C-alpha cells in the first residue's frame, strides 16, 4: 500500500510571497521578475540567473544565502537542500509540517520558475559524451517535481511561454494564483520532466546500441490543435518531438491557412517520397492523394517532371499535395496553379515563384530548407489496443542494393534506369503495390489491394484511361517497366503486367514459386530483377 494521504482544505487562491528562479534559458526572465515586484515578492535565485537579475537592479537573495551552504562540485549541488525542498513540499495546513518548518527555519516557496539544462540541444549539437552528461539537469527536475506535487500551495513554471499567463493570473487575483492555474502548471511540469527523462533514456539506448529497450517512452510538445482529425467527429493535434529532419514538421508555412490532420499526413508522405531522388542529380516531383502517389516523375527541370507526373493520373491529382525535391521556380509555379492543389512542399521557392503562388490564397506553400536523407534512421510507432508497435524506418535505398538478374534476358540500360526509378516509388505506395513506369515517370499505380493481381490490373486500367484523356492511341503501359513492393506469389500477377505491355519487372523475390514466376517471365520475353528487399507499407 502507498502513502496514506492527509486531507486538508485546498485554497482556491494562494498568495505568491516568495519566488525561486533558476533558469537555463534567460529569455524574458528579467521582465518577468520585474513584473513580480509589483506584488512585493521575495526573489531567490541561483548562480547565473541571480547574476542576471542583480545586474538588472533587482533585489535577489542567492540560494547559498538561504541555505547557508555554497554551491559545490561545479554547480552540481546547489538547490538539493532541505531548506529548499522543505519550502517547496511543506503542506501549510498540516500542523506537523508547520512545526517542522518553524523548527528548522523553512519559509514556504509559493512559485518556482525553472527551465532545465538544454540536454536535447546539446545532443543535437554533436557534443561529446562528457559534455552531454554535464547537461543532464538534476536539481531542476527535483525541484519541479516537488513543487508540482505540492501544487495546492506552490505554482511551478517550466516554460517561458507561461510567463504571460501567470502574470495575467496574478493581476486578475491581486497577487494570487488560482488552484486551477496551479493544477495546469503542475500537469505541464510533470509532462516536461517526463519528456526530459525520455530524451535522456533515448540517448543512453542509442549510445549503447540498444534497439529494443525494456521500457519505451515517447514525448513531444504541442505545436498546434487542428480543427478535427481524419474526420470531423475526431479530435486532433500535432506534437513536435526532437527529430530535426527536413519535412513538414519543421517547415515554414509561407502562405495559406494552417494544415489539417490529413494535410499533415499526406504532405509528410509526399516529401518522404520525393526525398528518394537526389536534388543534386535530378529534378523530381511527387503528386499525392490520401498518402498514396498518383504521379511521380524525374526531369531536367521541375516543370518537365511535374507535367510527366501529372500525365499519370491528372484526375486524382486534383486537390492533392505536390512535393518537389528542388526549390520551386517560376516556370513550374505557372503550371501548378492551373489545377486546385491543397499543399506545395519544397526546399525553397524563388521570389518569382512566390509571387505567382500568392495569387492562390487557399494554396498552402511549405518551405523546408532542405531535403531529408532517405537513409536516415529513426522509428515509426503505431498504437494498438493495449500497446504500441515500434519499428525502424524503411531507410533502404535501391542504389545500395545488389540487384540480381534472374531471367534469360537482362534489362537494357534504359529499362534498368526505369526499374530503379519504379522501385523508389513503390516503396511509398500502400500494399499491395504495383507501379508501371516509363521514361523516369510513373504511368500507372495500383495501391492498397488485397490481391497483387488486382493492383496490377487497376494500375493498367488507370494508365489506359490517362492515355485516352491525353489523346494517345495506346496505353501508357506499353513498353513500360513494373515494380512490385513484394514478391509475386504466383505467375498470374506477372502475366497481368506482361499483358499490359510491360517489358521488365523489379521485385524482391523470395516466393516459394520464384522458379515458376521466372519461367513465366522468360516465356513472355520479360527481363526480371530481384532486389532481395521487400517494401510493404500499411
From Swiss-Prot:
MGS-like domain boundaries: 8-158
Gene Ontology BP annotations: 'de novo' IMP biosynthetic process
EC number from the UniProt entry: 2.1.2.3, 3.5.4.10
Keyword field: Hydrolase, Multifunctional enzyme, Purine biosynthesis, Transferase
One Gene Ontology MF term: phosphoribosylaminoimidazolecarboxamide formyltransferase activity
Catalyses which reaction(s): (6R)-10-formyltetrahydrofolate + 5-amino-1-(5-phospho-beta-D-ribosyl)imidazole-4-carboxamide = 5-formamido-1-(5-phospho-D-ribosyl)imidazole-4-carboxamide + (6S)-5,6,7,8-tetrahydrofolate; IMP + H2O = 5-formamido-1-(5-phospho-D-ribosyl)imidazole-4-carboxamide
Annotated InterPro entries: AICAR_Tfase_dup_dom_sf (IPR024051), Cytidine_deaminase-like (IPR016193), MGS-like_dom (IPR011607), MGS-like_dom_sf (IPR036914), PurH-like (IPR002695)
SMART domains for this protein: AICARFT_IMPCHas (SM00798), MGS (SM00851)
Gene Ontology cellular component annotations, sorted alphabetically: cytosol
UniProt key word Hydrolase: yes
Domain of life: Bacteria
Classification via SUPFAM superfamilies: Cytidine deaminase-like, Methylglyoxal synthase-like
Pathway linked to the protein: Purine metabolism; IMP biosynthesis via de novo pathway; 5-formamido-1-(5-phospho-D-ribosyl)imidazole-4-carboxamide from 5-amino-1-(5-phospho-D-ribosyl)imidazole-4-carboxamide (10-formyl THF route): step 1/1; Purine metabolism; IMP biosynthesis via de novo pathway; IMP from 5-formamido-1-(5-phospho-D-ribosyl)imidazole-4-carboxamide: step 1/1
Pfam families referenced in this protein's UniProt entry, alphabetically: AICARFT_IMPCHas (PF01808), MGS (PF02142)
Family of this protein: Belongs to the PurH family.
Domain comment quoted from the record: The IMP cyclohydrolase activity resides in the N-terminal region.
NCBIfam families linked to this entry: PRK00881.1 (NF002049), purH (TIGR00355)
HAMAP family the UniProt entry points to: PurH (MF_00139)
Name of protein: Bifunctional purine biosynthesis protein PurH
Amino acid at each position: 500500500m502507498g502513502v496514506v494521504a492527509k486531507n486538508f482544505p485546498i485554497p482556491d487562491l494562494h498568495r505568491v510571497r516568495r519566488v525561486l528562479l533558476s533558469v537555463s534559458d534567460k529569455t524574458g526572465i528579467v521582465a518577468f521578475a520585474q513584473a513580480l515586484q509589483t506584488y512585493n515578492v521575495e526573489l531567490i535565485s541561483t548562480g547565473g540567473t541571480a547574476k542576471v537579475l542583480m545586474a538588472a537592479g533587482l533585489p535577489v537573495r542567492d540560494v547559498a544565502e538561504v541555505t547557508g551552504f555554497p554551491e559545490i562540485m561545479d554547480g552540481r549541488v546547489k538547490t538539493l537542500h532541505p531548506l529548499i525542498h522543505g519550502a517547496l513540499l511543506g503542506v501549510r495546513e498540516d500542523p506537523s509540517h508547520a512545526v517542522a518548518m518553524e523548527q528548522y527555519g523553512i519559509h514556504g516557496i509559493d512559485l518556482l520558475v525553472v527551465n532545465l539544462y538544454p540536454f536535447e540541444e546539446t545532443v543535437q549539437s554533436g557534443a561529446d559524451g562528457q559534455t552531454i552528461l554535464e547537461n543532464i539537469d538534476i536539481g531542476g527536475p527535483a525541484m519541479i517535481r516537488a513543487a508540482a506535487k505540492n501544487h495546492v500551495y506552490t505554482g511551478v513554471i517550466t516554460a517561458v511561454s507561461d510567463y504571460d499567463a501567470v502574470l495575467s493570473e496574478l493581476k486578475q487575483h491581486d497577487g494570487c494564483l488560482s488552484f486551477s492555474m496551479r493544477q495546469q502548471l503542475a500537469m505541464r511540469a510533470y509532462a516536461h520532466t517526463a519528456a526530459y527523462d525520455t530524451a535522456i533514456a533515448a540517448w543512453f539506448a542509442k549510445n549503447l546500441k540498444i534497439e529494443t529497450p525494456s521500457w519505451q517512452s515517447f514525448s513531444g510538445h504541442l505545436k498546434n490543435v487542428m480543427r478535427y482529425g481524419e474526420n470531423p467527429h475526431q479530435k486532433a493535434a500535432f506534437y513536435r518531438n526532437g527529430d530535426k529532419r527536413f519535412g513538414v514538421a519543421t517547415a515554414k508555412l509561407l502562405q495559406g491557412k494552417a494544415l489539417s490532420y490529413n494535410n499533415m499526413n499526406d504532405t509528410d508522405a509526399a516529401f518522404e517520397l520525393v526525398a528518394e531522388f537526389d536534388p543534386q542529380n535530378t529534378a523530381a516531383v511527387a503528386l499525392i492523394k490520401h498518402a498514396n502517389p498518383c504521379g511521380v516523375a524525374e526531369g531536367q527541370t521541375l516543370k518537365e517532371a511535374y507535367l510527366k507526373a501529372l500525365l499519370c493520373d491528372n484526375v486524382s491529382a486534383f486537390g492533392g499535395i505536390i512535393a518537389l525535391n528542388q526549390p520551386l521556380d517560376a516556370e513550374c509555379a505557372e503550371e501548378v496553379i492551373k489545377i486546385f492543389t491543397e499543399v506545395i512542399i519544397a526546399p525553397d521557392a524563388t521570389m518569382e515563384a512566390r509571387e505567382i503562388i500568392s495569387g492562390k490564397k487557399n494554396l498552402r506553400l511549405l518551405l523546408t530548407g532542405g531535403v531529408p536523407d532517405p537513409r536516415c534512421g529513426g522509428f515509426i510507432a503505431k498504437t494498438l489496443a493495449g500497446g504500441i508497435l515500434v519499428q525502424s524506418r524503411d531507410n533502404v535505398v535501391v542504389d545500395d542494393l545488389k540487384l540480381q538478374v534472374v531471367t534469360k534476358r537482362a534489362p537494357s540500360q534504359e529499362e534498368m534506369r526505369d526499374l530503379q526509378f519504379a522501385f523508389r516509388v513503390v516503396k511509398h505506395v500502400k500494399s499491395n503495390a504495383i507501379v508501371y513506369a516509363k521514361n523516369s515517370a510513373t504511368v500507372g499505380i495500383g495501391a492498397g489491394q488485397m490481391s497483387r493481381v488486382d493492383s496490377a490490373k487497376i494500375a493498367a486500367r488507370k494508365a489506359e484511361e490517362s492515355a485516352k484523356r491525353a489523346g494517345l492511341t495506346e496505353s501508357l503501359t506499353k513498353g513500360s517497366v513494373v515494380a512490385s513492393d513484394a514478391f509475386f506469389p504466383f505467375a498470374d500477377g506477372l502475366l497481368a503486367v506482361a499483358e499490359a505491355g510491360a517489358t521488365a519487372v523489379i521485385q524482391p523475390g523470395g516466393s516459394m514459386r520464384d522458379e515458376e514466376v521466372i519461367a513465366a517471365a522468360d516465356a513472355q520475353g520479360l527481363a526480371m530483377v530481384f532486389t532481395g528487399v521487400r517494401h510493404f507499407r500499411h
